[in-house]
Amino acid sequence: MIRTAFIIAATLATFAALPAQAEDATVGSLKISAPWARATPKGASVGGGYMKITNTGTAPDRLIGGSTDVASRFEIHEMKMDNGVMKMRPVTGGLEIKPGETVELSPGGYHMMLVGLKQQLEQGQHFKATLEFAKAGKVDVDFAIESVGAQRPGTAGGAMPGMGSMKMK
């Protein structure tokens, strides 16, 4: 009896430790995969969202905006080096997804900016957002919330991109 209870508790603890998973979405010839956001500290007014968008069609499309109940505004931003200084700016005219290509929204690059957060984004939770594309139209997407410093889905905070397979001595 005690052993069975221990096994059940250990199994539940294992599943509780797994990262939140979000489902992929499709609209027209666009596939949105691995949508996720970083958790935010209490009182934060902005948050960031990330995903991959693959265009399997023959014509380009553009991510032109979106909306969500967790923030007042949804903006598409880019981070870019300018004379040795990292700068963030809104993307004007939308983010192009060329035919046969995948565009990744990730920390330090293109990302969706959630401005005027109405609630804290808590690790392990999810939120819905509606993405709007110039040609494909609107699609509802479920975002999994990862840790505050996550660099990609399923990573611990502070992990540097591409460093996961390095052996440290």
What positions do the PLM features span?
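Sec/Tat signal peptide C-region and signal peptidase I cleavage site
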Residues: L18-A22
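Compact, glycine-rich, soluble single-domain proteins
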Residues: E23-K169
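Bacterial N-terminal signal peptides
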Residues: A5-A16
